[in-house]
């Protein structure tokens, strides 16, 4: 691979508002999505806003997953950034879309740390 990692920017629409407004459930689903993708979870931090919305991050050995929700719009903005080749960020995005009971998801993949020559990084 000539890139250090893959960064998925996902727009998830038509989600269940009750799910998107539940901090504990969002944290659980985000951790599950990281594990579903084959990642190793290191740390988590989530915050519930008033009157609604949740933001959070799951730090993984391979990078991170982040989310910001707008329950009133049924919308979640999700970033899944993974380094190396053993973790598939699309698996996490698809898992989240399913668990949020979303109507649809659009996403863009960005290669991060692109080098002209193949790179070899320890433990990746």
UniProtKB/Swiss-Prot annotation:
Is synthesized initially as an inactive proenzyme. Formation of the active enzyme involves a self-maturation process in which the active site pyruvoyl group is generated from an internal serine residue via an autocatalytic post-translational modification. Two non-identical subunits are generated from the proenzyme in this reaction, and the pyruvate is formed at the N-terminus of the alpha chain, which is derived from the carboxyl end of the proenzyme. The active site is at residues 63, 68, 83. This is S-adenosylmethionine decarboxylase proenzyme. It comes from Acetivibrio thermocellus (strain ATCC 27405 / DSM 1237 / JCM 9322 / NBRC 103400 / NCIMB 10682 / NRRL B-4536 / VPI 7372). Pathway: Amine and polyamine biosynthesis; S-adenosylmethioninamine biosynthesis; S-adenosylmethioninamine from S-adenosyl-L-methionine: step 1/1. GO terms for molecular function: adenosylmethionine decarboxylase activity. Catalyzes the decarboxylation of S-adenosylmethionine to S-adenosylmethioninamine (dcAdoMet), the propylamine donor required for the synthesis of the polyamines spermine and spermidine from the diamine putrescine. It catalyses: S-adenosyl-L-methionine + H(+) = S-adenosyl 3-(methylsulfanyl)propylamine + CO2. PANTHER family: S-ADENOSYLMETHIONINE DECARBOXYLASE PROENZYME (PTHR33866:SF2).
